[in-house]
A protein has these predicted regions:
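Flavin (primarily FAD) cofactor-binding/catalytic cores of flavoenzymes
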Residues: 2-39, 84-184, 188-396
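Flavin (FAD/FMN) cofactor-binding and adjacent substrate-gating region
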Residues: 44-78, 230-250
């Protein structure tokens, strides 16, 4: 039985770094908002155990308005240090610590649907509650956007699956695995598989592997480093500084934005992974052109005519934003959102073409640059959101 409850001024959907940060900033500004979601769920349930963050320490803090809920503060309170690179399980624990400190009002419940209303948005919860929100902030992450290459379209998930479908790769013990992809997710998954004693091969389309963080000393040259590198840690020298200023970045011609964004976020592995990849066959410059069941195994045909017979293909094939794939957006609402290649077209305040509907995180990257695809972009997103709402409330 549906239960109609009192309306609210704002709703935040998502309890990862962006949702938690937005809630903390809005609360500090005295702006009412209910926040729904399971804290750090994607990080815990859709990333394999044993992984580490590629971003450096300074770029991995979850932004808060008082700059007090840092990783350093977390370590001091917990009484132990977090190793570098940052282990995934410690980052998840840090996010939950942040939530307990700053967003205790979080409701660990699931939104069923969001639809347009005459004065805002109609919200329906899975548990039957219904209410209207004047404003909706979508910080739901990328879990709805996983890419499954068409070559694997007819292959059952028991034989081919996306990396985001797993929280522990040790389940593949006793099987032979091919990892498709050549970025951080692919390479670290391969390392974890080998360390678990699982035979693995990496197959990537590019002619060579790209790496980040091979020259850490360049980040510790004082004033010189600050000229070329931003503390946000997104992109190489020069580009790093540019993408750290979204309002400046978005003023450049679209072609330049696209080239700079690709250079900042192209598939690449962290330099600290290299020793862990020794002994793993890595086939580059090759593409899987077809995949088919063969008995209880999977046969992969590559574009050079070679074949692989494996027990499972792990698809580290990334994510492609398409906000119409968010299951909680009603079809009629999703159809009204102006988009470009799946990304919502956003204006100041990260607001979509539908007044009062905001998108934070990766969906904001087309409008505001690649910084919004990383934890370090949450400070900009939360600050911009608060400014927009405050400005609008002040004009009413």
């Amino acid at each position: 039985m549906n239960k109609r409850t009192s309306d609210c001024d704002g709703l935040i959907l998502g309890a990862g770094p962006y949702g938690l940060s937005a809630a903390a900033y809005l609360r500090a500004a005295g702006i009412e908002a209910r926040i729904f979601g399971e804290p750090m769920a994607f990080w815990e349930k859709q990333m394999p155990a044993g992984m580490c963050l590629r971003s450096n320490w300074g770029a991995s803090h979850i932004a808060d308005p008082n700059q007090q809920l840092t990783l350093d503060a977390y370590c001091r309170e917990k009484g132990n240090q977090v190793s570098k690179p940052i282990p995934l399980d410690r980052f998840v624990d840090y996010g939950r610590w942040y939530q307990q400190k700053s967003v205790r009002e979080l409701e660990n419940r699931q939104v069923l649907s969001i639809d347009h209303a005459s004065h805002g948005f109609n919200i329906a919860m899975v548990d039957g509650e219904e209410f209207t929100a004047r404003r909706v902030v979508v910080a739901a992450g990328i879990s709805s956007f996983s890419v499954r290459p068409p070559e694997f379209a007819g292959v059952p998930s028991s034989l081919a699956s996306h990396t985001s479908a797993h929280d522990d790769l040790r389940k593949f013990k006793g099987r032979r695995v091919v990892v498709v992809g050549a970025g951080q997710s692919a390479l670290e998954s391969a390392a974890l598989l080998q360390e678990a004693g699982i035979p693995v091969e990496v197959i990537g389309r590019g002619p060579s592997l790209n790496w980040v963080g091979l020259h850490p000393k360049l980040h510790h040259l004082g004033f010189v480093s600050r000229i070329f590198y931003s503390k946000r840690d997104v992109g190489p020298a020069g580009i790093s500084r540019l993408v750290s200023m979204p309002h400046v970045f978005r003023r450049f011609p679209r072609g330049f934005q696209d080239r700079a964004a690709y250079r900042a976020i192209r598939p690449a592995g962290a330099g600290w992974l290299q020793p862990r990849l020794v002994g793993i066959p890595i086939t580059l410059g090759r593409k899987v052109v077809s995949a088919a069941e063969k008995g209880s195994q999977l046969q992969l045909n590559l574009d050079d005519g070679s074949e692989r017979l494996v027990d499972h293909a792990l698809l580290a094939t990334g994510f492609r934003v398409d906000v119409t794939r968010y299951p909680f957006l009603s079809p009629s609402l999703a159809k009204q959102i102006e988009t470009f290649n799946g990304f919502p077209v956003l204006k100041r305040g990260l607001e979509s073409s539908i007044p009062g509907l905001h998108f934070l995180g990766k969906p904001a990257a087309w409008s505001f640059g690649p910084l919004l695809g990383f934890v370090s972009g949450a400070e900009f997103a939360s600050t911009e959101l608060v400014r927009s709402i405050t400005r609008r409330n002040g004009s009413n």
